[in-house]
Every structure is written in C-alpha cells, then in structure tokens.
Amino acid sequence: LSEFFLDIGYFTAITMCYFLVEGYQYTHSKKAYALRLLSFALISEVPYCLAFTQDGIIGFEGLNMMFTLLICFGILVVFERTSNKVLRFTYALFSIILSLFCSWAILAPVFTLLFIWSKGSDKKIKLSFIIAVLLFAAFNLAGGIGRFSMTTNILYALGSIVGTGLSGIV
C-alpha cells in the first residue's frame, strides 16, 4: 500500500511542475499566486513533518513540495522578466541549490526548466517527460547503492518511474 501512495506522489510531483509551467501564462496576478503557494506551503509544513515523525517526536524533515513549487514559480518569474542568459542560468542554479532543503530537491526545478524549454512543442514536451523519467530513475538508482542489492535496486528504480512515466502518458 505504501508503494501505491509513493507512486501517486511520483505522478503528482512531475504533474504539478508541468501544470505550473503551463498555467503560469494564465495567472492574472503573479504576486497573489506566489502568496497562495507560500500560504499553502506554511500550512502544510507541520503535517508534512508529522508524516515523517518517528518515535512520537516531531522533527524537521525538510520543506514540503509546496515550497519547492514556490521556488519553481520563482524560476518562471525570472525567465519571464529577463532575457539575460547569465542571470537566468544563475537564478536556475541558485534555485536548484535552494531546493536541496525541500522535497523533490533538484528534480522539481530541473523538471520546471525542461517544461519551460519544451513549451509549445509536443515533441519537446514528450522528450522532457522522457528525460524527467530517466533522471528520476537515475536518482533512485543512485540513492539505493549500498542500501539494496543490485537486483533489488534496479527493480526499485524501474518501479519508481511508473508514476512519473504515467504522468507523461496522461
């Protein structure tokens, strides 16, 4: 059952990044949107930490996915407001580093960048999802080294891409 919910989370995370990029242009107030993301990030942080609580002691488990989406939203704002490639690259790199304290560290900002790059092209969108799935599998494979046998690790990495892969198909 836990694997089922993990796969739902895998499906949801990449889907949220995709819809964040796709819906950005339709947002009437970028400031209000950012404030809503921040509000939901703050509201959901305690339940997020409680979900990972062990031995009845609440601890900080990093920032939840809503904070990650806020960082990704910042990437969209910078890419919209500046054409300076150095500034865009610097902010994207800063965002990826900042995401290390969040759920879906590194991956969500990279997914967002892929979807920005692919905007308007069905071929590029498909390629972006394929790259995202391969990146996710590589991260899971690397994370299992030393924790699982090679066979178990490969099976886990392949199983973990079901959710992200379905997101690209749907």
Feature-to-residue mapping (PLM):
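Alpha-helical transmembrane segments and their immediate juxtamembrane cytosolic regions
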Residues: 1-170
